[in-house]
């Protein structure tokens, strides 16, 4: 038989008020009084005692009935509240009238019930309780010989029963008003921060975008130095905006925790890549120590953990002029088979924290000294953000001195043990832009120093539609997209987007979220209606300075394919477009083609390599590109065979995803299509068909290789030349 307690807890936990708690207290107190009377006067008989006992039993039965009513109908009920109040005062007043002096302590119960109703239900109930309690006590005064014999005491207590709750009512209303005003002020602050973020991000978008375009042009040494200064200043300003938004989200309780499997040591390595050069520039010793008993594979919010470490270790580097900065990770408790609690210590030999600042160390906009905000850059939000994120992840954070100088900031986090990570071989997601030289070398992907050139070599030209009400933003996006090889049409409103899409087809749309008239969300909803009625599907990327969780979630629900924050980074924008290009590519006949043997029709879409050739990088470059991409494709096929043999269907889909991306880069239509089919197959389908699919892939890849060899040989011998389709 199951215990009813879990059901009772679930039934009462979601109630809007605490009526059930007050009723439970009433039941407990009444039961105790009945038990006491039964024990104390078990051999005593009398009408007064019997009347008192019957009153208490009646109150207990009615209270039990109220509790049943609460369980059956958990919604707020003003009728039940009034019945409970009337029950309390009538029973208390009746017992005080019957018992006289022995029941005089019940006056405190009467006052307690009055104040309790006010605290639980507000001023209106406090005034109603005051009236009920006063009338019941007045009845006791008029009936009981004891209270009649003490008129000064009786009328004084009655006056107190009226005056004290009324004074408390004035305090309660003042407190309620203060809480309401504080809530409104906090909401106004959040709106102000969101608006200021939008206003800051909009000009930053133009500044950041144009400097990225400028960085790809020919500059002399002095111009490069000036450009680097501008970009560093823009990044610093953006960092300040991000910090203010982070603290706003933390205060509003809107931090979302996303727990995933990750490698702790790899994550710490990524932090070191950012902060170690800064420490080296300040001539500091910088190191990390991870204890041997700390597991490497964990499950947690790696993004927020990295942000906490960047804040704390970054502060240590910033406020240390001599000595060292050390990050230590140790295991506090937990079994390696289940979960662990890890402690992170950030030790430095810097300026330390003065005694008078320590109580306010984790408060917003605080630094160890007023003058430090001038000497060191920053808002003073780093430790506050770290505290909010650590507590949101279920941990604790603190500070201690580091003798003889400096400080140690520490935090502890509970972590689950992660699942073994997939193959460590470098995977290049479809359309991904790989920036790390080590990854590029190990994966044999051609690396161009110019991100726009790299994008043009891998992604075919697309027709883009851009909508933004700010001319500077439209200009930035147009320059970035055209430099990446795309054809761009810019409009200044959502209505123009719908009109343009009704006239022509576009491969992708980039739209600002907040525009005069119809905004981006309304445009998305209208576009989905149009597409449901037969219009060609077009992915939409939302670009906005409003990066609140509500805005991002609203865009996802409206059908946006991606959300990018202003100021847009060229690499992030190009990465997103590369992913869209692979998923929506229509292998149509282009304006410029290269003639290949008819036996290769359907195998090779030569327009992809034609666009690469149009960049004018030479025949040798094209041959090298083809050779290395074919090697990548062959490796992906080998990975598919290995994954199928191991029955690792999730990894097999990732291998097929990588193969589709490489094949699309070469224009191998059949291979790309087969890779896409593998990605969409269920586990049971893969288990039954993967060997047959693998055999087909190998045949298609061989045919594609022959077609590419024929093309490259034809270009080399001068047998085929570009021609224009009329």
UniProtKB/Swiss-Prot annotation:
The protein's Enzyme Commission number: 2.7.13.3
CDD domains reported in the protein's UniProt record: HATPase_EvgS-ArcB-TorS-like (cd16922), HisKA (cd00082), REC_hyHK_CKI1_RcsC-like (cd17546)
Residue ranges annotated for the Response regulatory domain, each copy included: 463-581
Membrane-topology annotation of the record: Multi-pass membrane protein
SMART domains: HATPase_c, HisKA, HPT, REC
Function of the molecule: Hybrid sensor kinase that regulates diverse biological functions through two distinct molecular mechanisms. At low cell density, the extracellular concentration of the diffusible signaling factor (DSF) is below a threshold, and unphosphorylated RpfC is involved in the negative regulation of DSF synthesis, via direct interaction with the DSF synthase RpfF. Interaction prevents synthesis of DSF, which remains at a basal level. This activity does not involve the phosphorelay mechanism and is not dependent on RpfG.
Protein name as catalogued: Sensory/regulatory protein RpfC
Organism field: Xanthomonas campestris pv. campestris (strain 8004)
């Amino acid at each position: 038989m199951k215990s009813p307690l879990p059901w009772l807890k679930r039934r009462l936990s979601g109630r809007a008020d605490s009526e059930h708690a007050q009723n439970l207290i009433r039941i407990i107190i009444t039961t105790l009084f009945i038990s006491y009377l039964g024990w104390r006067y078990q051999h005593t008989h009398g009408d007064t005692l019997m009347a008192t006992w019957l009153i208490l039993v009646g109150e207990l039965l009615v209270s039990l009935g109220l509790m049943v009513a609460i369980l059956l109908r958990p919604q707020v009920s003003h009728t039940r509240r009034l019945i409970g109040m009337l029950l309390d005062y009538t029973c208390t007043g009746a017992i005080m009238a019957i018992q006289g002096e022995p029941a005089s302590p019940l006056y405190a119960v009467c006052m307690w019930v009055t104040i309790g109703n006010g605290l639980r239900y507000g001023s209106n109930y406090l005034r109603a309780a005051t009236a009920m309690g006063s009338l019941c006590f007045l009845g006791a005064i008029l009936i009981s010989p004891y209270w009649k014999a003490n008129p000064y005491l009786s009328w004084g207590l009655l006056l107190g029963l009226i005056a004290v709750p009324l004074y408390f009512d004035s305090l309660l209303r003042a407190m309620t008003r203060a809480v309401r005003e504080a809530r409104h002020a906090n909401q106004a602050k959040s709106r102000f921060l969101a608006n200021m973020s939008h206003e800051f991000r909009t000009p930053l978008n133009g500044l950041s975008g144009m400097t990225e375009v400028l960085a790809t042009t020919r500059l002399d040494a002095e111009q490069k130095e000036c450009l680097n200064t501008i970009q560093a200043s823009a990044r610093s300003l953006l960092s300040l905006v991000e910090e203010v938004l982070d603290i706003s989200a933390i205060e509003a309780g809107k931090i979302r925790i996303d727990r995933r499997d990750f490698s702790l040591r790899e994550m710490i390595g990524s932090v070191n890549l950012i902060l170690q050069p800064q420490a080296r520039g300040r001539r500091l010793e910088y190191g990390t120590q991870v204890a041997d008993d700390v597991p490497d594979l964990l499950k947690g919010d790696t993004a927020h953990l990295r942000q906490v470490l960047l804040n704390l270790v970054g502060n240590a580097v910033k406020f240390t002029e001599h000595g060292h900065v050390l990050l230590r990770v140790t295991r506090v408790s937990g079994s390696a088979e289940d979960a662990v609690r890890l402690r992170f210590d950030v030790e430095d030999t810097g300026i330390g924290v003065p005694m008078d600042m320590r109580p306010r160390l984790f408060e917003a906009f605080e630094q160890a000294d007023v003058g430090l905000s001038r000497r060191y850059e920053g808002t003073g939000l780093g430790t506050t953000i770290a505290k909010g994120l650590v507590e949101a992840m279920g941990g604790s954070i603190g500070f201690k001195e580091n003798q003889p100088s400096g400080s140690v900031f520490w935090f502890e986090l509970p972590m689950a043990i992660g699942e073994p990570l997939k193959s460590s071989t470098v995977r290049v997601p479809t359309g991904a832009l790989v920036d790390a030289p080590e990854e590029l070398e190990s994966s044999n992907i051609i690396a161009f120093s110019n991100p726009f050139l790299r994008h043009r070599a891998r992604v075919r030209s697309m027709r883009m539609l851009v909508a933004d009400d700010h001319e500077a933003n439209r200009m930035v996006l147009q320059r970035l997209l055209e430099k990446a090889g795309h054809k761009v049409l810019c409009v200044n409103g959502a209505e123009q987007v719908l009109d343009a899409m009704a006239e022509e087809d576009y491969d992708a749309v980039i739209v600002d979220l907040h525009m005069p008239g119809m905004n981006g969300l309304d445009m998305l909803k209208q576009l989905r209606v149009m597409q449901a009625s037969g219009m060609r599907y077009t992915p939409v990327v939302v670009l906005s300075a409003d990066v609140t969780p509500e805005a991002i979630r609203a865009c996802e629900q409206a059908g946006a394919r991606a959300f990018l924050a202003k100021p847009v980074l060229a690499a992030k924008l190009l990465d997103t477009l590369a992913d869209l290009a692979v998923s929506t590519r229509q292998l149509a006949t282009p304006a410029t083609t290269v003639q290949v043997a008819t036996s290769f029709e359907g195998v090779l879409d030569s327009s992809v390599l034609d666009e690469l050739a149009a960049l004018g990088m030479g025949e040798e470059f094209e041959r090298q590109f083809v050779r290395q991409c074919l090697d990548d494709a062959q490796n992906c096929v080998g990975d598919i065979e290995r994954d199928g043999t191991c029955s690792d269907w999730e990894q097999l889909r990732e291998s097929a995803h990588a193969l589709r991306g490489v094949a699309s880069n070469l224009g191998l239509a059949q291979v790309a299509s087969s890779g896409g089919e593998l990605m969409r197959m269920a586990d049971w389908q893969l288990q039954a068909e993967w060997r047959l699919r693998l055999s087909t892939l190998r045949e298609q890849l061989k045919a594609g290789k022959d077609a590419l060899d024929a093309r490259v040989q034809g270009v080399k011998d001068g047998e085929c030349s570009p021609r224009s389709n009329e």
